[in-house]
Amino acid sequence: MKTDKIRAMFLQFFKEKNHKIFKSSSLIPKDDNSLLFTNAGMNQFKKIYLKNKKKNQLSIATSQYCIRTGGKHDDLKKVGHTPYHHTLFEMLGNFSFGEYFKENAIKYAWEFLTHKKWLNLSKKKIWITYYYNDNETKKIWLNIIKIKNTHLIKIYDKKNIKYNSDNFWKMGDLGPCGPSTEIFYYQKKNRKEKKSIKSYKELEKYCLEIWNLVFMEFNQITKKKIIKLPIPSIDTGMGLERISVILQNVKSIFHTNNFIQLIEAIKKKIKIKIKKKNNVSLKIISDHIRTSTCLIAENILPGNEGRNYVLRKIIRRALCHGYFIGLQKPFFYKLSELIIYNMKKMNYDFHIQEKIHKIKKILFYEEKQFYYILENGLQKLKKIIKNIKKNKICEQKIFTLYDTYGLPIQITQKFCKKKNISFNINKLNLIIKNNKKKQKNKEKKKKNFSFITFKKKSIFDGYHIYEKKSKIIQIIYKNKNVLKLSKSQLGIIILDITPFFSKSSGQIGDSGKILNDKGIFIVQKTKKFDNYILHIGYIKHGCINIKDIVHAKINKKKRKTIQSNHSATHLLNAALCKIFSEKIIQKGSFINDKYLRFDFFCNKTLTEEKINYLENIINKKIQKNIPINFVITSFKKAKKKKIKFLLEKKYKKTVRIIYIKNFSIELCNGTHHDNTGKIGCFKIIAYNNIGNEIKRITAITGMEVIQYFNDKDKINKKLENLFSTNIHNIYLIAKNIVNKNKKLLEENIKLKNKNIIEISKILISKAYLSNKKFLIIEKTSYIEYKLLRKLSDILKEKLKSLIVILINDNNKKINFLISITKNLKHIINLNNIKNIIFSVIPGTGGGKKTIIEGKFNIDKIHLYKIDKIKKKIIKYINKYK
């Protein structure tokens, strides 16, 4: 039975049982910061379970797309190595919010699995687990379903910790929870059927878990205390791919109809003969291209944080496995096309076909970046290997390659294994783990104010005013609540109402003063933590007390320049959409009083001509003095109006819309002018590609533009004085200088090459012939690295069967090059020659079969030592015919 049919049957079954069929929700959870991705069918109903949302429908069934790549549900490392794990999967589920409970949930599951009309699975092959003190569930299975007692397994708490069991499900440390009953199906082939399964270990060995029924009947209010919920709920989950394994009678999810088609299509596309040992890599690539394609279709881009980092991790893991099977050029991006057909009959539309061009571009760019990192990282690894002793590499150095240069650990392992070099993987994992802890602690210190006990929320009232009479409701000094701040003390002040804008929407927070007749507090920055506006600064004069009535005054001049930059950012966003036929995706912005920075995703490049056009559009809108208005509405309504907003940002129910008439409309809670004319003027000062088709524009407005041109004018005048001409002629003069310089460099290279040819003639005349092999060993001076190689190549062209050793003295840095002609590479071992040299002059170096390069650990080389090396090498080469 094919996967599509199983899904359709499941939904039809529950439709007949009066369940409302819901579509799969997005892979990106809505209004839930606790999850990176949707990882279970119940995610979209979480608020109903938590009683934060009214239930319109009592019984629901879904087929939900899920991703499990981290945290409690981290399937990423298992993918390809086990038969049943993958990162993107479908979870079939039925849910009830008070309409039915344990008995019906169990009856429905049993009927769907075993009835002839539905899946018709063998009852003899089904085993059940239940929570040890859930006697109600036990009775239902034994007395109503009539399952054999030998097929019912009691699961206890782990380590005698109450409710810590595989059969007791929790939403979190606290909150809704309850016992569960799991359904397993006997899956071992080519063996006599095991008559009795008595433990969970045996279950996992012989059976496959196919369905988990969770009975949400408790609320955990402390670590040890749970109470009954007023209305119990049902939450069940059955992996579509897992049940497909059973119904299609195959070994693993990678042999089910959807995956087998994809894997075969991948084999054709990559045009590489896949060996049996590489099947794991092929499975990983097939899983990861599905997940990567769907995530990019959901507007997630590869990056270094959160969801973006997970996507990058998935892509790079697939690329590593591509590298292992011999794919050393971009290939992954081509595979995304296969997903269009592979996921055609999905129950959720990712719009892959419409977005395929964008998806391929993003994947291609990520691959190019990966191969650059790989090449650079491997070069650094080779250098490290050159200097190691006893074929053992330091774990800290491998960590640096991974953490600083991005070289994947798997590739380092493979490379070192080939070279018979070892390192302690457990020690390396410990270094990685400790580093992650350090980074987390740093981030907490930077971003988190959770160490402070906050009292009352503060209100922002500063969109149209610059000062406000306020009351101090809280003072924090050295992370503690205090009654007052005195002169020079650094601290945080919270007001009941404030005109200070806190850092948000890419805009920096306000600075200014909080003062009364007793003292002055200088506000250096304003931040927001939850609903508290924190004025961070120091006492300049006198003191400030709790409950004081104060005047809160923002830096008006600074605010106005920030407003200019923020309103200009909206004009820039709209102008970019006008220039490019395809829509751009805003990825972020930074706005202060000096400049604005705008990051956006776009497949196309901004030429110089387009940048000028962009500036003209924006400056014309500024000159027209267009009103800038705002309106408060619900996020739901705003989405229906197709208003621009950041795809990855979490918005509140109520949002603020900024309108620039007939040109721009965006969600934004930043501060703006009331008309475009107040921006003054606009100038782009930088444009670059910051990665993965993400472009960055840096621009200035108002007085900063005037200052920018004043500075340019000063430079122009200096150039005019220097060249005794006007600015219009300077470009031609500079061009002539550059061209002359190029010619001089070319002439210099010609002279150096001529010199190398002359040196080669002298060295050939000194070549020593021994045992039908030529040996040149000479000391040279001040020859560049590239030219030393060239000299070696010239010598090898002129003399067949040549061993050349060049010792180059280059201002206290003495390096060497050992090389042989190709016909000697299977006769003469260069490492042996290197060791002979090192026995006379200590040094380090390494390379290939035909060339070794390195350096000596001394400042000066005497000729008698070169003679000594020569004698030893002649003795060595005379051994070989």
UniProtKB/Swiss-Prot annotation:
Family of the protein in this entry: Belongs to the class-II aminoacyl-tRNA synthetase family.
SUPFAM superfamilies the record matches: Class II aaRS and biotin synthetases, Putative anticodon-binding domain of alanyl-tRNA synthetase (AlaRS), ThrRS/AlaRS common domain, Translation proteins
CC cofactor: Zn(2+)
Record protein name field: Alanine--tRNA ligase
Organism, scientific name: Buchnera aphidicola subsp. Cinara cedri (strain Cc)
Primary location: cytoplasm
Superkingdom field: Bacteria
Gene Ontology cellular-component terms listed: cytosol
EC class: ligase
Subcellular location: Cytoplasm
Enzyme Commission no: 6.1.1.7
